[in-house]
Regions:
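Helix-loop-helix hairpin linking two adjacent transmembrane segments in secondary transporters
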Residues: 104-108, 112-164
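Extracytoplasmic
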Residues: 1-19, 37-40, 200
């Protein structure tokens, strides 16, 4: 997600991407993340924890790899949709995984997860220009980010055997989040954070 920003001038020059297209390139992943957050309940019912994380990592990896083969702006935009879909799914299911498997250390693990998200975003913005500076073209500099996603997928699949369905955790759903004041406050808080983060 953050690897695109530093290369936008190069991308626009190489692909003829308009200013509107450049805005879409950064907005589409965020839109997909929001849609997947709304679909979190359905995702949790349809997929096991193991499958949901694996599919999300696969989508992120393929989205990044697609950029190696993207000759123009349309394919670049589609890769952004696929990557955003993967990020959105993993962000929708990870809180349930943390709650289910790390109940006694939930705050620590959730903090580590949040730090990893922010740190990974910073690395994407910092390392991608460096990859271009050592001789890679923009295609390759962006496609390199398929590697950590696919490594994570290969690591996740064997260690996650036996994980149960997320829906088993959430059978007692309690009151609707739409009537929960704290849920609205948290939504506004994280929305403002992500809004500021993605408009820099």
């Amino acid at each position: 997600l953050t690897s695109i920003g530093p290369l936008l001038p190069t991308l626009r020059q190489a692909t003829g991407l308009s200013f509107g297209g450049a805005a879409l390139l950064t907005a589409l992943p965020v839109l997909m993340m929001g849609l997947m957050a709304l679909a979190g309940g359905a995702i949790n019912r349809l997929f096991s924890e193991r499958s949901a994380v694996a599919l999300s990592l696969l989508a992120i990896g393929l989205g990044a790899l697609w950029r190696e083969l993207a000759p123009g702006s349309v394919q670049l935009l589609m890769s952004a949709v696929l990557g955003g879909l993967g990020i959105g799914v993993i962000q929708a299911v990870m809180p349930g995984i943390i709650k289910h498997h790390f109940l006694n250390s939930m705050a620590l693990v959730a903090g580590l997860w949040s730090a990893a998200l922010m740190g990974g975003g910073g690395l994407g913005a910092a390392i991608t220009p460096w990859l271009m500076s050592i001789g890679h073209d923009w295609h390759s500099a962006l496609a390199w980010w398929a590697l950590p996603a696919l490594v994570a997928l290969l690591a996740w699949w064997p260690v996650s055997r036996g994980l149960s369905r997320l829906s088993a955790v959430g059978e007692n759903r309690g009151p609707s989040l739409l009537r929960n004041r704290r849920a609205w406050l948290l939504g506004a808080y994280f929305g403002l954070i992500n809004g500021g983060y993605t408009t820099k």
